[in-house]
């Protein structure tokens, strides 16, 4: 992975290795170039020593940062302490924090700028129905009010997105032609959303661009990124 990152001129100086942790093994079941399901084998053995290293690294880099994306895979890396320290430091510097959550405890993301749960992740914290636009509006408001998060973008798969900001709701429709592999769609959404929002786009326009990026990513086989040049063709 580090070799691939270096080949693409991605900085690798701050990667932290843990020789005691087990790398997740993900087995994908494919038919006709479409992913049916995935089987994961893993252990959450992340150490407190690495938590301290991450916090120290975060503080050393925050002055060079335009925005922060927290992609929580619920593997032990995104500890409560790391999240609390990161969000607090970012807010002190007026840096926006975007969170792709996991699990049923969204309190650990308190005071983040934006959270982007999918429908399944929303169900983990919201007990109301999720059938139509109004239901998703209520869920967005509940998440922001309950967990003190400024904005919310719920990704709804083929039904698009619901965006909540300053007591205003917007719905973005999705139109994927063919869905071959949803792997990486959430990462594509939050990376695109954060990039365009930080460049000065409104949250709703940033979400529209992120939705468009995700549409094209799921139409490719495998975990495939979309380049800015590709995305510009569709804007």
List PLM regions with ranges.
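Extended, hydrophobic alpha-helical segments in both membrane/secreted and soluble proteins
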Residues: 69, 86, 97-99, 105-108, ...
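Residues that scaffold the ATP/ADP-binding catalytic core of kinase and kinase-like folds
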Residues: 39, 125-126, 164, 217, ...
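Conserved post-catalytic alpha-helical subdomain immediately downstream of the catalytic base
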Residues: 146-151, 175-234
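Residue-level signal for inorganic ion chemistry
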Residues: 68-71, 118
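Solvent-exposed alpha-helix faces
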Residues: 59, 141, 211-215
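Conserved phosphate/ATP/ADP-binding segment of small-molecule kinases
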Residues: 75-169
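Conserved N-terminal subdomain of the carbohydrate kinase-like
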Residues: 1-69, 225-235
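ATP-dependent carboxylate/acyl-activation modules
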Residues: 169-170, 227
């Amino acid at each position: 992975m580090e070799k691939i990152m270096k080949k693409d001129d991605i900085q690798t100086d701050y990667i932290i290795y843990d020789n005691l942790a087990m790398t997740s093994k993900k087995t994908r079941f494919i038919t006709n170039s479409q992913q049916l399901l995935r089987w994961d084998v893993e252990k959450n053995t992340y150490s407190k020593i690495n938590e301290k290293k991450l916090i120290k690294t975060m503080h050393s880099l925050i002055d060079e940062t335009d925005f922060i994306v927290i992609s929580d895979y619920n593997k032990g890396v995104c500890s409560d302490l790391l999240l609390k320290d990161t969000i607090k430091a970012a807010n002190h510097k007026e840096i926006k924090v975007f969170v792709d959550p996991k699990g049923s405890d969204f309190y650990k993301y308190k005071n983040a700028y934006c959270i982007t749960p999918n429908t399944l992740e929303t169900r983990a914290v919201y007990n109301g129905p999720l059938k139509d636009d109004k239901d998703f509006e209520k869920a967005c408001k509940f998440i922001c009010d309950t967990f003190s998060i400024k904005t919310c973008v719920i990704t709804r798969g083929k039904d698009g997105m619901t965006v909540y900001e300053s007591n205003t709701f917007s719905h973005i429709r999705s139109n994927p032609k063919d869905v071959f592999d949803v792997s990486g769609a959430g990462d594509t959404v939050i990376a695109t959303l954060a990039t365009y929002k930080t460049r000065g786009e409104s949250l709703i326009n940033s979400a529209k661009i992120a939705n468009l990026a995700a549409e094209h990513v799921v139409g490719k086989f495998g975990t495939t990124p979309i380049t800015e040049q590709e995305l510009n063709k569709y804007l």
